Amino acid sequence: ALDKNAAVLCSDTIPARYAFTNAHLFKGEFEPETVIAVDVAGLQLFGEGNGVPRYSRHVDLCIDHHAGNSGYADFTLLDGTAAAAAELMYRVILEMGVDITPHIADCLYTGVATDTGCFRFSATTANTHLVAAKLIEAGCHVEELNTLLFDTKPRARMEAERIARNHLEYYLDGRCALIYLTRDEIEQTGVDPADLEELTSLPISIEGVKVGLTLRQQPGGSYRISVRTAKGVDACAIARRLGGGGHNRAAGCELLGNLENAKNAILAEVEAELDAPQEDA
């Protein structure tokens, strides 16, 4: 729209279901005039894949909604009250005077809907719904997108979910539920690693559970841990003590060592948080 070349780079492989969002963008290597990071709260979260470190050494602008953003970029557009980074992108596009085409609306709606769990997460605000409404007015294909994003699961993802459910464990008098997948199990199913993000909602959906944990072994052997919590329990505080971060109700960290060590480390922090005086989170 502004006659500029743009490319999207992500350390992880972008899932096939999101291919429509960047199909028209530049492909290949080039020397960017400006590097912009979106929805990345700290340098350690960029990852090492797909040549990302070449570009993340110097970031000109960061657009983010994580209150704990480390301020690594030259300039930062930060709103910790926004439920999704795509809400901020919507504002930026309007300020730039760009017309929101149906394709742009599809991309922004995808960001808003996925970051809010289809508008179910506690961070969702009236403004989130207003932005979604404006995107629908602009021509986004809301029915098709919701079906693609929330009602369609690859078979490999279903197999991974079956295995994870079989590993379901309860701790701390049922206040904490945990599921996990080893690297062998992930490779056995052939599941797209990005589809595993959807597993994080399983343990916290169980009645009576205050903290839901999902552990996924990474190619190097470490365990990526996703923390989801009920109202009044600070997920970010749990993850932060282990070098991670995130939001009040959704956070994560990564731990070296075997499965039992990872379990013990995260459960110790969960117990400490659950036994501490709680405020609404």
Where are these regions (language model features)?
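Short amphipathic alpha-helical segments
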Residues: 48-51, 74-75, 239
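Short glycine-/acidic-enriched loop or helix-start segments at secondary-structure transitions
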Residues: 45-49, 72, 224
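Hydrophobic helix-and-loop "lid/oligomerization" segment in the mid-to-C-terminal part
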Residues: 1-13, 17, 31-32, 114-242, ...
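Short alpha-helices
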Residues: 65-131
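Short glycine-rich anion-binding loops that position phosphate/pyrophosphate groups of nucleotides
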Residues: 40-43, 66-68, 183-184, 218
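Short beta-strand "acidic-cap" motif of Rossmann-like dinucleotide-binding folds
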Residues: 8, 62-64
